[in-house]
Amino acid sequence: MKTIIYNNIKKACMTLCLVGSLASCNDYLEYKPTAVVDEQQAFQNPDEMVNSAYAMLGDDWYGYPFNLWTYGDVASDDALKGGSGTTDTDYHQVEVFTTLTPTLGHLDELWYHLYIAVSRCNRALVALQDNGEAKLGAETTKQRIAEVKFLRAHFYFKLKMVFNKVPWIDEDAYRNNSQEQIKNDEYTAEQLWDKIIADFKEAYDVLPATQSQGGRVNKVAAAAYLAKCYLEKGWGDGYEGSTGANFVNKEDMKKVVEYTDVVKNSQYGYLEDYGDIFLPEHHNSKESIFAVQHSNYEDDHTTYGRGNWSNVLNGVWGIWSCGWDFHKPSQNFVNAFKTHNGLPQFNDYADENAHPVNGAPSSQKWDPRLFHTVGMPSFPYKYEGAYTLTTANSRTPNTYGYYCSMKEVPQRSKGETYNSPWQSFAMNDYVIRYTQSMLDRTEALIELDRFVEARQIINDIRQRAANSINKHISYAANQCEISLYPDTYFQNKEKARLCLRWERRLEMGMEHERFFDLRRWGLLSTTLNNYFKKEQNDEYNGQKYAQYYKGAHFTPGKNEYFPVPYPQLYYIPGLYSQNRGY
C-alpha cells in the first residue's frame, strides 16, 4: 500500500513538473522581442502608420536618390557626373547611355526603395480603413487617407518618370497578398497616368488649402502635382515618334491650366530674390509648395539629424570636409546663360565657350541666375567671400571641368548636418516650387495659343531674376544683363515654345528636371547627341575635359526610359516585361 501511494505521489509530482515546464516553455514561446515592430499592434495605431509613410519621403541615399538628380541632370546636357573619375559610382552609364544595362545596381536600389515607400502607404491605408475612425474619428481619418493617397501618387510619379513600365500595387493587392501576381504592363502609359491622377485627385478633393502642421501635404500641392501629371500625360508616351508637338492633347493642357489656377490664386508666390530660394533660412517660404523636410542633429537632438542623404556626394571639393564634387554643371549649361541686349542667345550660345571672371567684366553679359546656380573659379562660393572658389576646388578637372553646383548645398559658414565619413546637409529638397508650377502653366497656355498670358508669366519670372542681383551677387552686377521679352517673341507657337523652354532650363537648372523636359518635348536624341559631340571638345583655359563623351550616344526609341532592373525581372520570371530596346 505504501508503495502504491508512493508511486501515485511520484506520478503526480512528475505530471505537475511537466505541466510547469510546458507553461514555462509557452511563456518563452510567447515572448515579444524588443526593437521589433509588431505588425498587428502597429496597425492599431493608424496615425503612426501615416507617419511611417511620410518618413519615406527622405529615406533615400546617393545610390537611390528620390530627387532623381542623376536621372534628371546627369543624363541630360546640364550636368556631368563628377567625382574622382568615370568609375566612381556606376552613374557613368547614365550619362553616356551606350553602356547602360538592366544590371546597373543603382536602378534596382531606386526601384526597390520606391516600392518600400509604396508599401508603407498601402499599409497605412489598411490601418486607416480598419482602425482609423475608432482611433482618430471620421473626419481626421478621411484627411489622413487623402494624405497617404497623395504620398503614394508621389512615389508612383517617380517610378513612372524613370521606369515607365511599373506594376500598380495598391492597398487591395496588399490585403489580398497578390503583389507578386501583378504585371508591370497591365496598364498602358496613359492608363497608369490615370491611376496616379486618381490618387492625387482624391487628395485634392479632401485636403485643406493649408495645414496646421508644417510638412503635411495640402490641396494646393495636390493641384500642382495634378498639373504636372496632366502635362506629362498630355505630350504622348515619352518615346520619340509618339511624343512631342504633334501629339499634344489639348484637353490635358486645359487641365494643367485649371489646376495651376488653384496654385496661382493660393497663398504661394514668387520669393522676392532668386538666391533666397536656396538658402535654408527660407525653407517653407511662399515659394515652397511641396518639399521634403530635412534637419540637422542640433534641431532634432539625434546623432545624424534628418539630413539630405541623396545629395551626400555633391559638396564642393576642398570647401566641405567631405565634399566629393559630384553633380558638375556642363559648359553647355553655362553657355545657355549668355545674353545679348538682355535676351538669350538662342542661335549662337554654344558657338564659343565662355565663362565670367570675377572682377574682369567683358562684353559678354549673363543672366544673373547663373551666379546663383553655378559655382565658378574666382567667385565667392554661395555669396561668401571667405570661401572664394579656385581651380583647386575641382576634384578631377581634366575629366569634369571646374564648375560646381550650388543650389542643393548650404553656405559653408552654416555647416553640415553630419560630416564623417559621409556628409549630409539640412537642405530641404523641393519637389514643386511655385515658379515651376507657373512654368507648367505657361507651357500649357502656349499649347492652347494663349500667348499673351504666357509671355506675362515668363516676364514676371525674368523680372524676379533681374531683381536678384544686389542682395547676394553685387560682385557680379557689372556682368549681368537681363531684359523682358517684347511681344514679337510670342507671335506664334514656335517662338513662344523656344522662350518657354529656354526659361525653364535657366530657372530650374540643376533641379533635376532637364532630361524629363526634353523627353516630354520629343527633343532628347537631337539635343543630347549634338551635346555629346560638342562637349567632348570643350576646353576651360586650354584644358579639355569630358573626353568620355566620345563613346556616348542616345538611341531614340530606347533610352527615353531607363531599363527595368534585372533583379526585378528575374525575381518572378515572366511576370515583368522589359522596356523597349534593352
Show the residue positions of the predicted features.
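Long, intrinsically disordered, low-complexity segments
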Residues: 28, 46, 101, 114-117, ...
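Short coil/turn linking the two alpha-helices of tandem helical-hairpin repeats
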Residues: 160-162, 167, 211, 229-241, ...
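Conserved, well-structured interaction surfaces
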Residues: 47-60, 85-163, 181-194, 198-216, ...
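Bacterial N-terminal signal peptides that target proteins for export
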Residues: 2-13
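Short, surface-exposed recognition loops and adjoining beta-strand edges that mediate ligand/DNA contacts
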Residues: 35-40, 44, 63-86, 169-172, ...
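Active-site beta-strand/loop architecture of penicillin-binding DD-peptidases
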Residues: 385-433, 581
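Membrane-proximal, proline-rich intrinsically disordered regions
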Residues: 25-72, 105, 565-582
